[in-house]
Every structure is written in C-alpha cells, then in structure tokens.
Amino acid sequence: YGKRAMVKVEKFGTMNELECVIKFNQTYRREPDGVSFCPYRICPLGAHIDHQYGKINGLAINYGINIAYAAKHNGVVELSSLNFPKRAQFYVSAVPEEKVGDWADHLRGAVKILAELYPIRVGLCGVIEGSLPIGGLSSSAAVIISFMAALCRLNNITLQETELILLAKRVENEYVGVSCGKLDQSCEVLCRKDHLLYLDTKDDTYELIPTSPSMKPYKIAIFFSGLERSLVGSKYNMRQDECKAAAYALQAFSGQEYGKFAD
C-alpha cells in the first residue's frame, strides 16, 4: 500500500523486492540504481464499467510488480523475468511498429508511446518479478507502469499521475491490443493505504475514501483458480463491444439521446 510507481525504493522491505535485487546482483555483479514498484489492484465494483465511462471503485494491494534496474546508456533495454523464461532485449530507438506477441510487448509499447512525447535515449538492464500468479489482478498494467516509471527516472522525465495513467492505457489499447478502460491504471497509480478509490471515468474526477475509524477490521481474500490467462487473445475485446451495444440499446429504448453507435 501507499508506494508510488515513480518512487525509488531505498530499502527492500519485502521478500519479492529482495529476491529481485539478489537476482540483479547475481546477473550484473553490481547494485541496481533503483527498484520500481507498482501494486496490483482489486475491483469491488466497476469491472466492464470503466470502458463505458461509468463510476468505479478499487483498492491497491501490497503485492505487485518489482523491477530492479540500472541505466544502459547505449539505449538497450535488457530485462530478465523471474516469471517468464524469455529475456526481453531491444533498442529504445528501434521498437517494432507491431507487437511481437510475447510478454515484452508491454515494455516495447511503453517505450513507443512514451517516445512520441519525450526523448528516450537511455535504456535499462534489470530483473522483473511479479508476486502472486499472473492474471486477474491487472499485472499487465502494473508491468507497464513500473517499467515506464523506471524509464522516466533514467531519462529525467517527470509525469503527472493523470498522464502516467493515460499513457499506460494507450500502451494496452494501441500497442498490445487490449481495449481496456482506465480502471486498472487508475487504481494502481492513485490508490493509497487504507483508502478506497472512487473514480468517475467519464470526467476523471476521483475521491480517496478513508477507512472509517468505526469500521470493524477486515481482510481481503484473493483466490487463485489454478488458471492463468492473458487479456490478449481472450474474449475481453468482444465483451467490451457487447457492453457498448447493450448500453447503446438501453439509451435508445429509454428515450435518451443515443447518437451514433461509433461515438
């Protein structure tokens, strides 16, 4: 809770962070320049509502994506994953126009989208790891945000929270090919410890609602079904279209202005 994706972690407070740093030391025989962390999120209410510009809420949890990293001034990105066998390696100046089809598409997309607005000259070497099984907690958004935060730090780029959210969303929409809304990115960037995020995805106004002192203690249970999935290649985009069609029909039958379906 409470950690910002843009903040360098000075002390390695969890086993996952420590494992990431140890692997970096073993690989590169040096200390990392920093560790970028982005939490996973849970969504009590709002799934499939954000891409229809509705109101959602969410919580960040104290598990997520860690990247132990150091600068590479030759412009190379070289990232090993503790969760996937293949190492990502590419030049920041030569990102393919189309996705390749592996987990590193999230990194390539982050460079491509960020480079449209800012000069990216410094790459990075590092180790990335994700606590908990992949899928269901917005790990893809967390990978993009934690990587983008590290890349920004090394290239002296400062992003506001809203800009980071929108850029990370563009990576998923325009490069990876997932027609997601902004629920995942907003929860992972805006949430704070002991607060519930309430967000209107139409106008981006939000409120962080603190836990009431009179509220009884609670715990959040997350169950793993044994199945791992990726939104890419799933029927997520079709579900988004179905929600859009349903909302359009409801507006029409209720007598409201419904305009053109494409809008």
Named regions from a protein language model:
Residues 1-45, 53, 66-100, 195-263:
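C-terminal nucleotide
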Residues 31-32, 51-54, 92-100, 129-137, ...:
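A short glycine/serine-rich beta->alpha loop
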Residues 41-42, 73, 83-86, 128-134, ...:
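Acidic, glycine-rich active-site loops and adjacent beta-strand->loop/helix elements
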Residues 60, 137-157:
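DPxDG-like acidic metal-binding loop motif
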Residues 98-132:
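Helix-rich "cap/lid" substructures immediately adjacent to catalytic or cofactor-binding pockets
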Residues 116-125, 151-167:
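Phosphate-handling active-site elements
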Residues 158-206:
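Alpha/beta catalytic cores of group-transfer enzymes, especially the acyltransferase/condensing modules
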